[in-house]
Amino acid sequence: MPDTTARILALRAAGTSLVVELAEPVPRVLHWGADLGDLPESALAALALTGEPAVLNNSIDIPRRFTVWPTEADGWSGTPAHQGHLAGASTAPRLSLAGTSYQAQDEGGELSLRLTEPGAGLDVTVTYRLEPSGVLAVQSRITRHEDADPAPYDLAQVATLLPLPRRAQEILDFTGKWSRERSPQRRPLGFGTYARQVRRGKPGLDSPYLVTVGVPGFGFAAGEVWGVHIAWSGDQQYLVEQLPEGAGAHAAVLGGGELLRVGEIRLAPGESYTTPVCHFAWSGQGLDGLAERFHTLLRDRPNHPRSPRPVILNSWEAVYFDHDLDRLLRLADKAAEVGVERFVLDDGWFRGRRSDNAGLGDWTVDPVVWPEGLTPLVDHVRSLGMEFGLWVEPEMVNLDSDLAREHPDWVLGSSRGAGPSSRNQYVLDLANPQAWDYLLEALNAVVDKYGIGYLKWDHNRELHEAVHGPGDRPVAHAQVLALYRLIDALKERHPGLEIESCASGGGRVDLGILARTDRVWASDCIDPVERQSIQRWTTQLLPPELMGAHVGSATSHTTDRVTSDTFRLITALFGHAGIEQDLTRCTPEELARLTAWTALHRELRPLLHGGRTVRADLGGDATLLHGVVSQDRTSAVYCWARVATSPEGQYGRVPLPGLAAEATYQVRVRTELGLPSLHQTSGPGWLAPALDGWLTLPGAVLTIAGLPMPNLNPEQALLLEVRRTEGASGA
């Protein structure tokens, strides 16, 4: 990309913009947020002039500027862009601009800034790439000069930071646990630092996921919001920071990066460290607007799944470790009968794996359980017209395995002995080249022998004491990079191989792993009450086609809650759909309902996996309305769900978000999956005609005024379909 002589540079796309001034010694961010338009040089100069803050009492004697790489040299007292030292020295970096490359496009572009720090012998390159979706991808690279002091530079922290305005005063992020991932939490932004640190070796079940700051009371449909997601599958940190003196002309900062373990990154001359990509996005239309940006970003990727997402049956909740060929053949027969398109054999197929106490690491088919190998099952599944997939957990190892007995040094952990196990397992040291080579060849052999087209890739134990080698050197960073290389190498050998990211359910859901996998398992919990919330918030970052959403048996295997098949089936429609139950024990009525469900999913799949996700602001958690609207707003499907009781009798009119107010639509209730139980004597006036067929209504009535919704009993759902009538305008 060419260098530029301009002093103020802008990137613009999809209603958002970034403006940077090439100030000396370090450039500063003048604006990130709503698009300022195609500003002439005079207007850009005015933006720079008005971006100069006041000099405060009892403060430094020059205006504080918030730079692209904030340090104490700028008078910045907040979290610095980086911290490190040379044997306890060179701890106060002073950077200066050494080069710029800039390429603006009609929608987006890229700005790269090279900074130099002679004291520690560092070059820092910060690259801003504004995608056509309006998502701003920021990545930095720190390199030691070839002729630098031979002592290693210990890099302790790198944080990517962008400014926030004063009106951004409320924080939304996430927490969770096993079977309850991505639980939202809100708090006001006060003075100081709000930091979320993850030290699990993966984002974790309590992952911050997507940290959003917005105007007070922002919701799904309204309110200005700014968000960041760190595309990294290991330790990470997010922060929102507001100092009394502000951040230059701005009020606060938002950002984060990889959380580096002490002594993990030591740069010798010529060596580099590259940060994960931090994805920033702004929306003036609330959380749905923010989600749309990320969904567009992901769908625009060259490696985004293009073929229809096949309906899956996963064997885990059907048979667990009881791998019996005849039983699995019968299960496959039933799966094909109800319309399943991909059959996945879960945990229990490999050597010594009769429980979770043993076998992990020995990735060959158990000859006792499978005397003829997997071939009889694989061939039968394919003869029924289904694809065949397999569960693996390559990064984990049981001490009761041939692999651990033969190579105890391949187990990641302290030289003073293994720490506590998790589900009876430990982590394999992927930074060990021999262990990495073994895994690649073992996985390749299984995939190659059986023509496996799909792997469910699990990961359970956290990376506690992620050290190896003499002196117990930290390798959490190297472990993630080795994982990425392993998946990339396996996919290179097997073009078309699809991989699902699973980590005790939804413990590794990030755009780093999704750069090389094809979907995520949102949670081990498929109880529809829990899944309504889990899926609602997983789609804040991911489009539905990347999120596994399965229907299970009436009694949930994780909560023991009993729910209706109608509620379970409607909930599982809104993702990459699948089944987790023993179909050989289903009644004919249950099988008929599942058959109708798979047919309905195939009918709605182009809409569900290509439309815009919308969610209604209802002011409480007892009832939920969410849906998917086609990009041209000609069709939509909505779920109206009640997950708990509430004092409300009438809900008032509930707008169906995303439709064109000026158009005319038809509405009907889809009844193939059954009808919900109602907590009322009779339904609202529109419900009966919508149950009988298509009811024609103006778009303004549907999306502005709204429909009075039926009062459902708890743990019930209603499915609405909407289509625009011929000849109606309103694109």
Regions found by a protein language model. Give the residues of each.
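Short Pro-Gly-centered flexible turn/kink motifs
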Residues: 95, 265-284, 715-722
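Aromatic-lined carbohydrate-binding/catalytic grooves of carbohydrate-active enzymes
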Residues: 306-441, 454
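Polysaccharide-binding surfaces and accessory modules of carbohydrate-active proteins
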Residues: 7-10, 18, 27-244, 664-682
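Carbohydrate-binding surface patches
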Residues: 15, 210, 222, 618-661
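Glycine-rich, aromatic-flanked loop segments that form ligand/cofactor-binding clefts
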Residues: 63-96, 220-236, 280-303, 340-347, ...
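Conserved, mostly hydrophobic/aromatic
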Residues: 15, 140, 270, 313, ...
